[in-house]
Structures are given as C-alpha cells and as structure tokens.
C-alpha cells in the first residue's frame, strides 16, 4: 500500500503540474505578471490535497476533482494577496509579497483576477454546477467576512475567545470546509454527508489556525518563510493574546506596552504562564472534533482523511 506521504507528494506534484498548465495570457503584463508570480509559489497545497483526498473517499470524477482543487487554491491565493496588503507583510513563502514586489494597486488587481479565474474553473464543471458554485461562493464570502472581523478585532481589548473562534471559523475554516464538502456535493451525496464534511473541515480549520498562531510565535522563521511575531506588533487578538489579556492582565499590559521587548520575551511569557500549553490543547480538541465528524463514513474512506488531520496537526510551517 502506498505510504501517505508518498500519496500527498504525488497529489501535490500532479496539482502543480495542472496549475502550471493553466493558460495565463501574457498581456496585459500589469495584470498577468503578478498572477504568474503568485501561482509559481511553492505553497504547501494543503487545500488541494484535502480536495483530492475527499474526492478519493467519494470516488469523484478525477477531472472534476482537479478543477475543484484548482478553484479553491486560486481563491486561497487571492485572499493571501489581499491579506498581505492589509497586514503590510513584505514576505510570503520566502519571497517578496506581490504588493511589495510591485505596488498595492497591482496586487489588488492581481487578486481580483485570480478570484475570477477560480470562478471560471469551477463553472466549467458539468456535474452539479449550480450546487458547487453556490457552496463555493458562500465559503469564499465567509473568508472575506473572517478577514474583515480579523481587521476589526485588531487592538480591540473587548474581543473574547468566542469572538476569535467565530472569526477563524470563517477566515480559515470555511474554505477547508468547502475543500472537504465540495467533492461530496459533486458526487450528489446526501445533505447530511455534505454537512458532516463541511463541519469536519471547519473543525480542521480551527485547529489549523490556532496551530498557525502558535507557529507565528514559537515556529522557526526559516521553515515559516517569513519573520515571526507580526501578530503581536499588529495587535492581533489571537487566542494566546486573549487568554493573556483576560487572566494575566497587569503582566500582559506591561509586556505588550514595552516596545523594547523581543519575540523571546513573549515566548517566555506564554510558556511560563502555561498559555502555550492551554492553546495547544485547544487546537488538539478541534483536531479531535474533526476526526469524530468523519467517523460516520465507511472505515475505508476514513483512513486517508485521518492521516491528513495528523499531517496538518504536526506541521512545522
């Protein structure tokens, strides 16, 4: 039997081959040069891999599954381009962000173009087209809502952990839910099955984002392909920050208001007060919830999806 990491490597290579084959016009260069630059990036392809694993579970048509995978990855890249502008990040996947390489106006247009490309690909699927587009667009809108909430929450000291969890379900969970559920929609599975896959992906997304927030503080900048600690400097209300603010009010205020403090000071604070431990446990709970959702599937359909959860849970970048 093929090893799981060999399977995901194969899916990633096949996906990259299809993405590189996608016809991107040469002109106008103002639009298509930054799009080509973005899509040549060495992403982890977590979302396309999930689409393909879900497609394998439901025995979906391979060509249609690939189109779904392309569509969700394009939407993901569209959000990254615009997020980088909003967060003023200068590096993504180890290379300059689009707005840093060109300018904000170019990056905005490139993101718009990539989003439109995703729509064209999804609408070219001949089976269940309306249902796929409706589900896909609802998830895409939720991602935008989540990003809006993330910006609204910056430096807002009234934000609670429930607010944060609602935000990450939209910003990260909705698209991963779509990755898991769209193959079930394609294969005309029951509403109960589609919903279970959506909830599976949303729980996976919550665990993914909480884990990502931890990597933003405790990760290796070389593996992450970017500098760390920007969540702190931008006033992001992550779960760690909310717990610190609510339960270690004076110590957190002194630390966060001291502009001379370094990332290592924050690491020590979160570890010493067992905030890191609590947040890691929270991520584990969401990964566990994701596992429970797919246990309604036949056993042979669960194995690869459970392996995927473990892969996401143990990632270091």
Sequence positions of predicted segments:
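N-terminal amphipathic/basic leader segments beginning at the initiator methionine
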Residues: 1-23
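Hydrophobic, well-ordered secondary-structure elements that form the walls
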Residues: 241, 290, 305
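Mg2+-dependent prenyl diphosphate-binding active-site environment of isoprenoid biosynthetic enzymes
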Residues: 24-253, 310
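Mobile late-domain/C-terminal helix-loop "cap" segments
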Residues: 251-295
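Short, amphipathic C-terminal "tail helix"
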Residues: 299-317
């Amino acid at each position: 039997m093929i090893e799981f990491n060999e399977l995901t490597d194969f899916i990633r290579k096949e996906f990259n081959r299809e993405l590189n084959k996608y016809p991107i016009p040469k002109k106008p260069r103002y639009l298509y040069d930054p799009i080509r630059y973005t899509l040549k990036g060495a992403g982890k392809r977590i979302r396309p891999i999930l689409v393909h694993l879900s497609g394998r579970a439901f025995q979906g048509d391979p060509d249609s599954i690939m189109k779904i995978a392309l569509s969700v990855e394009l939407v993901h890249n569209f959000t990254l381009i615009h997020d980088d502008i909003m967060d003023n990040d200068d590096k993504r996947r180890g290379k300059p962000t689009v707005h840093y390489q060109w300018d904000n106006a170019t990056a905005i247009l490139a993101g718009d173009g990539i989003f439109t490309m995703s729509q064209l690909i999804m609408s070219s699927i001949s089976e269940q087209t309306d249902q796929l587009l409706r589900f896909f667009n609802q998830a895409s809108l939720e991602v935008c809502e989540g990003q809006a909430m993330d910006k609204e929450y910056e430096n807002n000291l009234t934000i609670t952990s429930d607010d944060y969890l609602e935000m990450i379900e939209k910003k990260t969970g909705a698209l991963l839910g779509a990755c898991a559920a769209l193959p079930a929609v394609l294969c005309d599975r029951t509403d109960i099955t589609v919903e279970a896959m959506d909830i599976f992906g949303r729980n996976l997304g919550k665990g993914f984002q909480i884990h990502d927030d931890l990597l933003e503080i405790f990760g290796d900048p070389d593996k992450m392909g970017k500098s760390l600690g920007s969540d702190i400097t931008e006033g992001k209300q992550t779960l760690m920050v909310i717990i610190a603010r609510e339960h270690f009010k004076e110590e957190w205020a002194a630390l966060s208001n001291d502009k001379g403090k370094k990332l290592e000071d924050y690491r020590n604070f979160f570890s010493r007060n067992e905030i890191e431990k609590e947040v890691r446990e929270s991520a584990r709970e969401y990964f566990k919830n994701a596992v429970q959702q797919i246990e309604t599937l036949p056993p042979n359909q669960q194995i690869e999806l459970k392996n995927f959860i473990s892969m996401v849970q143990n990632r270091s970048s």
